[in-house]
Regions:
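Short acidic-glycine-tyrosine-enriched beta hairpin
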Residues: 79-95
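Ligand-binding loop in jelly-roll beta-barrel domains
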Residues: 89, 95-114
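Conserved hydrophobic/aromatic beta-strand scaffold that supports enzyme active sites
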Residues: 46-48, 65, 90
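Short, conserved beta-strand element in jelly-roll/cupin
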Residues: 51, 60-75
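A short, N-terminal "cap"/entry segment at the start of jelly-roll beta-barrel domains
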Residues: 1-43
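Conserved short histidine dyad/triad with adjacent acidic residue
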Residues: 39-60, 94-95
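Short hydrophobic/aromatic-rich beta-strand segments that constitute the beta-sheet cores
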Residues: 58, 75, 109-112
């Protein structure tokens, strides 16, 4: 009998990969992103993500669940509702959510896209 393999990440440590710059910056400060992909298939993605200070236009193309472990940022939706993020925050962004993200202190999160 074959059992599914559990995914375990003891530490992000040296596994972090540079994923480049945010593609839709607002202003001169361009956020840099990096992370670690835990699992990816055609219908989901799970991983660790971190982002430096800056602001950008944000469009979530699939449902995304996030648990923020460090930093501070604000998500402002197109209808002007605001989500303030701090360590320990959990957020869910539905497919096609649009708005702006402003990172004021480098953020780190674990996420699941589905």
């Amino acid at each position: 009998m074959n059992f599914p393999k559990a995914i375990h990440l003891k530490s992000t440590g040296n596994n972090i990969i540079d994923w480049g710059n945010i593609e839709t910056p607002i202003g001169d400060q361009i956020s840099k992103v990096s992370g670690y992909l835990l699992d990816k298939s055609s219908n989901h993605e799970m991983g660790y993500w971190q982002c430096s200070e800056g602001e950008w236009d944000c469009h979530v193309t699939k449902n995304e669940f996030c648990h923020f472990v460090e930093g501070e940022c604000t998500y402002t939706s197109e209808d002007s509702s605001v989500i303030n993020i701090s360590p320990g925050s959990i957020a869910f962004f539905p497919k096609d959510w649009k708005g702006k993200c402003k990172v004021v202190k480098k953020i780190k999160k674990f996420y699941c896209i589905f």
